[in-house]
A protein has these predicted regions:
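Helix-to-loop junction immediately C-terminal to a conserved catalytic motif
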Residues: 54
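Conserved ABC ATPase "signature" region
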Residues: 117-135
Length: 267
């Protein structure tokens, strides 16, 4: 499985008086089983990029390939793509609507045309995977806590068995404990299923200890694409675009400078 973007551009409001060039010549590849952090401040293009990945937005120019097929080919099945590349929007609990958590999670598989038994089996598996307490399965989703609602919404996408799961700011609005619980859950889920996960965030601190690769977006361009250690080495450049490296980076840099100073004193 792979997603490949080749020189992708996206322009909002093309032909109007309010044009915004949201993506500028973005090229990258996402491989099977990766856990990727997609980082950038508001307006950097990261949310637009996620919607390009699963076909919700069509690139103004450039090409997107999924498993070797160009998704912009005339006969390409976009519905199938969106079931294979699952996108959990920011504040996904706003999309909960059924009378019970279980029914809500069944909604996606049902829309795929699966029979009742398969829908229910997938819902059970997905809810267990996100760590939802069984006694809450048949409660109203509106009675859940913020973190529980977030788990239910994520389960609704997982139940469609995507090959790629994109989470847009999954910890937004949660307290520190809720944030850690959601990120720990996502990490455990990735390890258990080997599903490709793309975690979208504006916080380096949130993703530093979870992902194996970081994409940094700035002003519509892919600024960095590397393992966390190499990306964080550019902490001064990151600061200039409003992003702070994890605290441990600054501690390491300070320690290195201190040792260098001590060494120079003994020379």
């Amino acid at each position: 499985m792979s997603i490949i973007l080749d020189k992708v551009n996206y322009i909002y409001g093309e032909g109007s008086g309010f044009v915004k060039h949201a993506l500028k010549d973005v090229s990258l590849a996402v491989d099977k089983n990766e856990f990727i952090g997609l980082i950038g401040h508001t307006g950097s293009g990261k949310s637009t990029l996620t919607q390009i990945f699963n076909g919700l937005l069509r690139a103004t120019s450039g090409d997107v390939y999924f498993n070797g097929d160009n998704i912009y080919d005339k006969d390409y099945d976009m519905k199938k793509l969106r079931s294979k590349v699952g996108l959990v929007f920011q504040y996904p609990e706003h999309q909960l609507f059924e009378t019970t958590v279980f029914k809500d999670v069944c909604f996606g598989p049902k829309n795929l045309g699966l029979d009742k038994r398969e829908c229910e089996l997938r819902a059970f598996e997905a809810l267990e995977l996100v760590g939802m307490d069984k006694e809450l399965f048949y409660n109203s989703p509106f009675e859940l806590s913020g973190g529980q609602k977030r788990r239910a919404a994520i389960a609704g996408v997982i139940a469609m068995k995507p090959e790629v799961l994109i989470l847009d700011e999954p910890t937004a609005g949660l307290d520190p404990q809720g944030r850690d619980e959601i990120l720990d859950m996502v990490k455990a889920m990735h390890e258990q299923t080997q599903m490709t996960v793309i975690l979208v965030s504006h916080s380096m601190e949130d993703v530093a200890k979870y992902v194996g690769r970081i994409l940094v977006m700035n002003d519509g361009r892919l600024m960095y694409d590397d393992v966390p250690r190499e990306v964080f080495a550019h902490y001064r450049e990151l600061e200039k675009i409003g992003l702070a490296a994890p605290q441990v980076t600054y501690i390491t840099v300070s320690y290195t400078h201190l040792r260098a100073h001590e060494t120079s004193l003994h020379l």
